[in-house]
């Protein structure tokens, strides 16, 4: 058997191309056609060109916020869909996805020119519309998600177009206001990236996460980028040593394989730093070596070779081939001790598993040159989680209950914690939130009178970190003297911190009012005047104040010198 092994070292780059925002439309169109030429037949390319001409004419007078021609956006969306190797109807719908909503073109026009299938895809994207997501509005969030899952059920390609649309919008966010950048990035990280993950499309998911991190935590992103660049040679030398050793042993065993090493994505590194409470310099498993082989048998054979070469870390082996993830992902994962005691991860999978890992559900809509049959066929059972969601939607009228179940079972919102009040209301809090955060999310009066908390019927300390599904009961007392300043070092949310600070400011203000009133009464007695007489112009002019309450609070001593 001929031994064949290819190796690559690369920093994480955009796998799906990111054309320059100001590239002329005609040049982008050529890029789209070039992308299609290797796998699509001439008839399909001609159909896409017809869709381009209609989209170009419809958007001819429109501009984006950047000032560039609007048509650039749908072309870039179509390029992303073509790189996912989706069918021509999806690519055509990508080009046309904004024409019904933003131009005079009608649904009937699309049906007449391109057929019912393309028109339905465009209609699906139009109806899905702009998500109005806010982390404090559970009802709105749940309704948006219901809408998205129903669209998925009708035709999964609608969501694929929407993901491509969001990806290009995230790539060109530099022209938006900072507050809009953060809003869109939070929406992306909380909704779009998790859905891309649930559909198994890692090529889109990882880029969405990285782009969202860039705008949500720009300082963190820049620090990570600098750190990775500064130690690039050292890290690449480390991973190259691993790749070369693995290549030699795999070749010797006669296994045909493609081997590459890569630095993990920014968001993945950031999560690792947060979860492990480490700096980037303290983390060495920033790398993953990937081995791609022809058969499942070769996967396990390669695993045996690797475990003979390096000492595996107990508890860090995962067999996702025997037990695939719900999003169709399959691979063998093992973490090992490498040179100088530094840990690193190896992933082993077949070439087909790799295609599914990169493209997810899109891999099963892949254009087939000799087969125009579309659909998921035998792969439909791998979307059982979507059918389960649809069953929940039918059975649940309560949006809060639906969202809670969705979070618990599908892990769509990993960065937030969803807890219940004793009455069953859902509270969404930042990961790491405490019972104090929970109390202030209900009302400031509840937080200010809080003296304890029970979680799932058990008394917990104030610094307990709430978990998904916790039922939280806040214990209050009218005899409470108010919050402690120590709470400011415990709470997670800015809302709770602000309300605690407001309480202390108010207390200081009330104490000043009492003290000021005492001084004013003493002053009035010494001058043989009544308190209301202080509002006469001669007194107000002397102290340069207009309101008696302000005299009470801030200027009581100034009157003593009159």
Where are these regions (language model features)?
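Alpha-helical scaffolds flanking conserved acidic
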Residues: 72, 87-96, 117, 121, ...
């Amino acid at each position: 058997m001929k031994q064949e092994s290819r190796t690559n070292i690369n920093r994480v780059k955009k796998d799906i191309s990111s054309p320059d925002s100001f590239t002329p439309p005609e040049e982008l169109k050529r890029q789209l056609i070039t992308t299609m030429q290797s796998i699509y037949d001439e008839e399909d390319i001609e159909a896409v060109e017809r869709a381009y001409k209609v989209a170009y004419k419809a958007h001819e007078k429109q501009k984006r916020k950047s000032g560039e021609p609007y048509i650039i956006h749908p072309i870039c969306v179509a390029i992303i869909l073509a790189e996912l190797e989706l069918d021509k109807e999806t690519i055509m719908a990508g080009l046309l996805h904004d024409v019904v909503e933003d131009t005079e073109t009608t649904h009937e026009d699309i049906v007449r020119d391109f057929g019912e299938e393309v028109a339905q895809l465009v209609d699906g994207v139009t109806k899905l519309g702009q998500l109005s997501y806010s982390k404090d509005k559970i009802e709105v969030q749940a309704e948006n998600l219901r809408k998205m899952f129903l669209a998925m059920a009708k035709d999964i390609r609608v969501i694929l177009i929407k993901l491509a649309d969001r990806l290009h919008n995230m790539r060109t966010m530099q022209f938006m206001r900072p507050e809009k950048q953060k809003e869109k990035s939070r929406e992306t990280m909380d909704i779009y990236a998790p859905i891309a993950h649930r559909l198994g499309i890692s090529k889109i998911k990882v880029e969405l996460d990285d782009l969202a991190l860039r705008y949500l935590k720009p300082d963190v992103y820049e620090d990570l980028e600098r750190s990775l660049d500064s130690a690039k040679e050292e890290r690449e030398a480390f991973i190259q040593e691993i790749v070369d050793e693995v290549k030699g042993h795999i070749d010797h065993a006669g296994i045909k394989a493609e081997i590459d090493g890569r630095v993990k994505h920014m968001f993945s590194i950031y999560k690792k730093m947060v979860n492990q409470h480490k700096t980037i310099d303290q983390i060495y498993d920033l790398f993953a070596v990937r081995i791609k082989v022809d058969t499942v048998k070769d996967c396990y054979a390669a695993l045996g070779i690797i475990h003979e070469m390096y000492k595996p870390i107990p508890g860090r082996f995962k067999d996702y081939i025997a037990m695939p993830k719900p999003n169709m992902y399959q691979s063998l994962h093992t973490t090992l001790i490498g040179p100088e005691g530094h840990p690193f991860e190896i992933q082993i999978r077949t070439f087909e598993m790799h295609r599914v890992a990169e493209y997810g559900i899109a891999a099963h809509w892949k254009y087939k040159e000799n087969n125009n049959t579309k659909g998921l066929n035998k792969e439909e059972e791998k979307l059982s989680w979507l059918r389960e969601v649809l069953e929940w939607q039918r059975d649940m009228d309560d949006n809060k209950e639906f969202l809670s179940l969705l979070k618990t079972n599908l892990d769509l919102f990993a960065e937030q914690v969803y807890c219940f009040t004793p009455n069953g209301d859902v509270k969404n809090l930042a990961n790491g939130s405490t019972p104090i955060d929970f109390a202030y999310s209900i009302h400031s009066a509840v937080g200010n009178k809080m003296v304890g908390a029970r979680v799932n019927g058990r008394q917990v300390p104030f610094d307990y970190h709430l978990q998904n599904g916790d039922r939280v009961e806040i214990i209050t007392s009218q005899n409470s003297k108010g919050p402690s300043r120590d709470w400011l070092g415990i709470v997670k949310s800015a809302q709770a911190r602000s309300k605690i600070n407001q309480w202390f400011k108010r207390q200081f203000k009330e104490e000043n009012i009492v003290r000021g009133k005492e001084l004013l009464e003493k002053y009035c007695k010494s001058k043989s005047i009544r308190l209301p007489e202080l509002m006469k112009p001669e007194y107000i002019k002397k102290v340069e104040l207009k309101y008696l309450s302000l005299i009470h609070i801030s200027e009581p001593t100034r009157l003593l010198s009159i």
